């Protein structure tokens, strides 16, 4: 079995938007639902995110199913222009764990232009946070407009940074059409069940 037999979900977004926190919320739910999964964390120069995830998921995911990929100075290179390092990791996962159902691939922090190579990700989630301002969807970067699912995280901060969730919702609908948008607080888990439902419908049961 190779990587083409495994559902691949890519998560991208700016630094600090909550990509790793979203992975930390999704993994226990996927595990509880009976899915065998792996996680790849891309970072510019370190394995810090991968190590954090290995610590978080001790006892839930085997350590060899959590891997780090160091992409160098351009985080989008490893997920778009040359995804070979990520694809090699997925192949390694599949060869050692033929029962694997899904791999979550977290990009290093990038800008609104970040997208995934379709060979690497079957489904693309782009994560932003309300702390970046309620004009972010209107900027229409490819990450915003092309993602299968837009996640707007840190909703609890909205009143503290003078951001309107209603404006974010309206603008997201305008620039994304029928593609879904989800609001989350990854610290508390609010909104994560909705994302799980979307992933199951769109990826795992597709």
Curated annotation (Swiss-Prot):
Intrachain disulfide bonds: none
InterPro entries: CobW/HypB/UreG_nucleotide-bd, P-loop_NTPase, UreG
Location in or out of the cell: Cytoplasm
Pfam families xrefs: cobW
GO annotations of cellular component type: cytoplasm
Signal peptide region: none
Binding site for GTP: 13-20
Main location: cytoplasm
Protein keywords: Chaperone, Cytoplasm, GTP-binding, Nickel insertion, Nucleotide-binding
GO terms, biological process: urea catabolic process
UniProt KW Oxidoreductase keyword: no
GO molecular function term, any single one: GTPase activity
Subunit structure as annotated in this protein's UniProt entry: Homodimer. UreD, UreF and UreG form a complex that acts as a GTP-hydrolysis-dependent molecular chaperone, activating the urease apoprotein by helping to assemble the nickel containing metallocenter of UreC. The UreE protein probably delivers the nickel.
Similarity section: Belongs to the SIMIBI class G3E GTPase family. UreG subfamily.
PANTHER family: UREASE ACCESSORY PROTEIN G
Function: Facilitates the functional incorporation of the urease nickel metallocenter. This process requires GTP hydrolysis, probably effectuated by UreG.
Protein's name according to its UniProt entry: Urease accessory protein UreG
Organism: Haloquadratum walsbyi (strain DSM 16790 / HBSQ001)
